[in-house]
């Protein structure tokens, strides 16, 4: 299409989760409560890890604190706007705001994928090589793992936004989701996006699939090692691994389903995106603290310290 014959789109229309006014009122209350719970739960983990010397000196809890920080960002890139849009008849987002959503989703999402692999490696060393744990999971190693997750997330998001922001958007501007989902946005471009879809598969799909396979291998090795131990000594390790596997499944399953097939869309995709953008950040604090006696003891200590100061 000749650039002289069209005007560029300056904003996009988001369809949201539903069109029913009654459901939107319910979703406003529900997701507002969920978002508050996400922020408070992850903030509590972050503050507990930072304030407790035993926790913030442990590689496992250092990584967990970083996961809580990323979850707060992952839940905040689109959820506040979605909540506000439940009360609005027109769900508009500017072009710049749309690109920002794509950037922060892939930045935090990519970083969290790599961080979850690092946490699986930490559990592998703790369970399979306990005598070498402090050597293999030194502070230098932990910092490198966290920095690697942030660098991968940043490079991944830049690579996604770089080709998306320069596409010509001149026709339809309606996105059938509650945020600017990359596969839906590039389909609005006034050009053939088949090659871009292939690029997206080799980027988002490859990142999520490779991290997921690494996690599967790690936890398979861990579970096999646990089975070889005496029954009485495996309960804590098995509980920890089960919690991690649950997080991995809830986070990676929807991501892989959505991003490895950008040329086809299903109505369930919109609901699946709720899992990795909202429910995973909500469940992480619960899963990682529910059976973790050290974390619960540190939280009680933090609460007692607060009562003492009052």
Swiss-Prot record:
GO terms for molecular function: G protein-coupled receptor activity; olfactory receptor activity. Its main location: membrane. GO terms for cellular component: plasma membrane. This is Olfactory receptor 4K14. Residues 1-25, 81-101, 160-196, 260-270 are extracellular. The keyword Transmembrane applies. The chain crosses the membrane at residues 26-49, 59-80, 102-121, 141-159, 197-220, 237-259, 271-290. The gene is OR4K14.
């Amino acid at each position: 299409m000749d650039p002289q014959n069209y005007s560029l789109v300056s904003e996009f229309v988001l369809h949201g989760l539903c069109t029913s006014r009654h459901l939107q009122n319910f979703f406003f209350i529900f997701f507002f409560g969920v978002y508050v719970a996400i922020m408070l739960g992850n903030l509590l983990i972050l503050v507990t890890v930072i304030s407790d010397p035993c926790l913030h000196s442990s590689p496992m809890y250092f990584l967990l604190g970083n996961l809580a920080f990323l979850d707060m960002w992952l839940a905040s890139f689109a959820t506040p706007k979605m909540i506000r849009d439940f009360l609005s008849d027109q769900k508009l987002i500017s072009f710049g705001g749309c690109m920002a959503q794509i950037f922060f989703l892939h930045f935090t999402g990519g970083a969290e994928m790599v961080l979850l692999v690092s946490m699986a490696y930490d559990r592998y060393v703790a369970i399979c090589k306990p005598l070498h744990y402090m050597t293999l999971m030194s502070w230098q190693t932990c910092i490198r793992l966290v920095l690697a997750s942030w660098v991968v997330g940043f490079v991944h998001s830049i690579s996604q936004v770089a080709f998306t922001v320069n596409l010509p958007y001149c026709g339809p501007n309606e996105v059938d989701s509650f945020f600017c989902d990359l596969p839906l946005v590039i389909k609005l471009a006034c050009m053939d996006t088949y090659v871009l879809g292939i690029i997206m598969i080799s980027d988002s799909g490859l990142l999520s699939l490779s991290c997921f396979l690494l996690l599967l291998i790690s936890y398979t090795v861990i579970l096999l090692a646990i089975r070889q131990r005496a029954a009485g000594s495996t309960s804590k390790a098995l509980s920890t691994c089960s919690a991690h596997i649950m997080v991995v499944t809830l986070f990676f399953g929807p991501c892989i389903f959505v991003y490895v097939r950008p040329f086809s869309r299903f109505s369930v995709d919109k609901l699946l995106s709720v899992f990795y953008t909202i429910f995973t950040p909500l469940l992480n604090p619960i899963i990682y603290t529910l059976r973790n006696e050290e974390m619960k003891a540190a939280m009680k200590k933090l609460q007692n310290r607060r009562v003492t100061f009052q």
